[in-house]
Regions:
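N-terminal non-catalytic cap/leader segment that marks the start of a structured domain
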Residues: 1-101
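Active-site environment of non-heme Fe oxygenases that use a 2-His-1-carboxylate facial triad
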Residues: 1-21, 34-38, 44-48, 97-249, ...
Length: 307
């Protein structure tokens, strides 16, 4: 197990009452709106380190801020959400620092800043709800939580509710997007450049739509498929559909990853310790099966993403 994960998981076991509302109320709001904004208890900005500017800084910060990170994980357990990390991403750390790092300066990723991060679902190359799971590969995360440590004026995470996007699309476009006519590239935050083919963008399960849409990493395998995808891309850039989430330090947003799209506008990082800084956690609504774990004897949160 990643040593920092071990430290914060142990601390999370001894921290209670971080979530400011009951599990039932949290999930009622989350599943009705597809997102919920909440505030972590006893958050103190004066205890924060500088915003990391390179990966080793982030690892040191995790140990320095281990109480905060343990409380953050504890809130997920209180909400009935199982925190996970994926093989090949974030060096195995459960918590990702969403801040501009110099090593990611030229990338469109959560650790970049200079480029707009257009609407997307995280980890879209993995199986989504309504698809048959692969026996020994983890599924796409159900939830994504962002906790704000340091805000940047004018820079927001924005959400689009999937149902409102689908309402705007013509029926024939939705039908095409529901066919296995697409190639999905694994996002830049992962090591390597794997992709999957012959998958749909949209899946309907139990009368509910789920999505793996990613503005940057999906393309159609036919002219018809690409045309439908272009129409969805255009709709997702309609800012009338965007819900701006201007988080303040200590506030968090948890959203349903496959029932929303999220985006972030570009900004110019200063790399001086004062840049925008959030902490990201992926979650599953159910504990993953042992077969999905990379090393089940070592860690119950690290999911396999390739054979």
């Amino acid at each position: 197990m990643n040593i920092n994960n071990n430290v914060i998981l142990l601390k999370s076991n001894h921290i209670r009452g971080v979530l400011p509302l009951t599990r039932e109320k949290f999930n009622e709001i989350l599943h009705s709106e597809s997102y919920i904004i909440w505030k972590i208890k006893d958050f103190d900005t004066h205890e924060l380190a500088d915003t990391p500017v390179k990966s080793p800084d982030a690892q040191l910060v995790e140990l320095k801020n281990s109480d905060l990170h343990g409380a953050y994980l504890s809130a997920h357990f209180d909400a009935g959400i199982w925190p996970v990390v994926y093989q090949g991403e974030n060096n195995g750390h459960l918590i990702r620092h969403v801040c501009p790092l110099k090593t990611a300066e030229g990338k469109i990723s959560s650790q970049g800043g200079k480029f707009d991060f257009y609407p997307h679902v995280d980890n879209p190359d993995l199986k989504i709800t309504g698809e048959d799971s692969i026996s020994n590969i983890g599924n796409c995360p159900d939830t994504l939580t962002l906790l704000c440590l340091r805000a940047e004026p004018g820079v927001n995470t924005s959400l689009l509710q999937l149902d409102k996007v689908i309402e705007v699309l013509p029926e024939d476009v939705v039908q095409t997007l529901s066919k296995p006519l697409y190639r999905v590239k694994r996002p830049d935050s992962f090591e390597g450049s794997l992709s999957v083919e012959m998958v749909p963008v949209l899946v309907k399960s139990n009368d509910t739509w789920y999505s793996r849409f990613d503005w940057h990493n999906i393309n159609g395998l036919s002219a018809e498929a690409e045309m439908a995808l272009e129409k969805m891309r255009a709709v997702t850039l309609d800012k009338n559909l965007w819900l701006d989430i201007p988080l303040h330090p200590g506030e968090a947003v948890t959203f349903l990853n496959q029932r929303t799209l999220h985006t972030r506008n570009s900004f110019n990082p200063r790399y001086d310790g004062t840049d925008r800084w959030l902490l990201r956690i992926f979650g599953l609504m159910n504990r993953p099966p042992i077969s999905h774990l990379l090393e089940p004897h070592v860690c119950l949160h690290h999911l396999r993403t390739f054979l």
